[in-house]
């Protein structure tokens, strides 16, 4: 396992290491904005299966796809309606997972049972600029709490990855999950999980 910190060379070493790991089909441990996560290529079935094995998790549970570069999500944006596109512009990057319509059934391994819906994350920070989208989930054993510090990640998880990126201590808040699948058609949005983005910020961006 290779370990690299985000504070080395302004994050360049961490970004390059993450791109290399993902492109080779590896699994990476990385700092999100609130908690540590596990990541791999969202089209690599073997790598995704490894993540589920590391976590001891049911592989039928959906996961979000994370983007660290606007260019990486340009094809996805073309499929979005006007109101969802506006929501992206107002809320991302940020501590929020947006569930959006997925008419082309992109990333079916992340969507699992319902490929018509896709969870999307975009975060800022030292890893911003990584060219590849990431299949991502929290870096913890299933049903155990996620960690906001590199040192707090259990050895069973940290020792099972190909790359570990130390980003120091994070906020400890998971992303707020918001369903936008009915926003364009009915003007409706729903919070599925409270987290790092407040309801007030959501109302300001999306309306009531």
Residue ranges of each PLM-predicted region?
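Active-site-adjacent structural elements in enzyme catalytic cores
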Residues: 1-208
């Amino acid at each position: 396992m290779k370990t690299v910190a985000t504070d080395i060379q302004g994050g360049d070493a961490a970004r390059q290491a993450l791109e290399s790991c993902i492109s080779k089909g590896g699994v990476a441990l990385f700092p999100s904005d609130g908690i540590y996560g596990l990541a791999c290529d969202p089209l690599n079935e073997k790598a995704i299966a490894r993540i589920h094995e590391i976590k001891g998790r049911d592989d039928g549970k959906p996961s979000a796809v994370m983007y660290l570069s606007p260019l990486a999500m340009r094809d996805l944006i073309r499929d979005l309606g006007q109101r969802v596109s506006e929501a992206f512009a107002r809320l991302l990057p940020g501590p929020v997972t947006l569930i959006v319509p997925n008419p082309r059934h992109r990333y079916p391994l992340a969507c699992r049972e319902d490929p018509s819906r896709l969870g999307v994350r975009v975060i800022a920070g030292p890893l911003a600029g990584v060219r590849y989208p990431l299949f991502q989930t929290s870096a913890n054993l299933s049903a155990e709490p996620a960690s906001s510090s590199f040192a707090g990640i259990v050895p069973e998880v940290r020792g099972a990855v190909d790359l570990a990126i130390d980003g120091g201590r994070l906020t400890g808040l998971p992303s707020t999950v918001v369903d936008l699948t009915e926003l364009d058609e009915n003007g409706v949005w729903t919070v599925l999980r409270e987290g790092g983005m407040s309801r007030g910020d959501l109302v300001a961006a999306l309306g009531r």
